[in-house]
């Protein structure tokens, strides 16, 4: 496993991907995403044990602006990827794309840019093969056009799924599969963080990924983030 971690470090050194920064305060009192914030035990996105590993890195020095925040600041999304083999007894590692929104650090397991998921079985030369396959694919991903991301998010923002709280909660439970308690928590969190009611696919994906941030176990968090990505897939061209 740690050979794979070393391979990821090699990839990070050769590409633009890194451990994400985090939100800090500014002199004006506004929350600001700082890509150069020092890595701490609380902010790291590398998790591992003797048997499993989960790593999430982003290209947060090349943001994609998807609109404006209520305070007039740009609303930024960053390309990223994760590698995981945390399923019990897993005999392979996989790498797939993910996106992170700067203002809230929500993560979306979304394959809108057609990045082919890479799977590497644990064999003697797994780390070398992983680096050889993943490095060029991630470099291409990082340097690609932002059109599909922007079009996908715009489509999600335009796709209305609810007119009131009752309809939104019903959608989160019936369509997404959240429990009544989780649906209520997601709806409330979205209102608190976005300062508007949940009405669109984009709103729902942000609500889901917001409550996912509270989940300490990465596998369980990723399950919710995949649900958000699947929602976005329903409207992305």
At which residue positions do the language-model features occur?
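Intrinsic disorder/low-complexity polar-acidic segments
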Residues: 2, 7, 12-236
